[in-house]
């Protein structure tokens, strides 16, 4: 009987909750890192503010910055607006959420992987 109660309680405690990051935390976590779904896309946040995205074999460049507790991406393309996201973290899992939009990007943070495109 005691074993059954522990089996139910332990998995619930092991699950980490996502929490929203502040500006200094965003900079510390993203600088020099890559966010990826490990299959289809990756977003690289270089130390010099350069942003590179790889998606389905297409490479795009731009700049990234942190403004008012949000991660902002400028794709340096007049056809794309700058986007700023709230950053939510749980372990190495990260979510980029836009205010007022329920769909968000989710992936992991890791050291950048070299790519040839």
Where are these regions (language model features)?
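Lipid interaction determinants
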Residues: 9-63, 67-117
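Bacterial N-terminal signal peptides
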Residues: 1-7
């Amino acid at each position: 009987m005691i074993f059954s109660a522990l089996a139910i309680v332990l998995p619930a405690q092991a699950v980490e909750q996502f929490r929203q990051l502040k500006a200094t935390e965003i900079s510390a976590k993203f600088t020099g890192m890559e966010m990826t779904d490990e299959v289809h896309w990756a977003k690289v946040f270089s130390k010099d503010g350069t942003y590179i995205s790889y998606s389905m074999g297409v490479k795009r460049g731009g700049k990234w910055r942190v403004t008012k507790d949000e991660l902002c991406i400028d794709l340096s393309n007049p056809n794309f607006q700058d986007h700023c996201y709230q950053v939510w973290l749980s372990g190495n899992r990260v979510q980029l959420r836009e205010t007022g939009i329920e769909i968000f990007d989710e992936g992991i943070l890791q050291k950048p992987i070299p790519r040839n495109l």
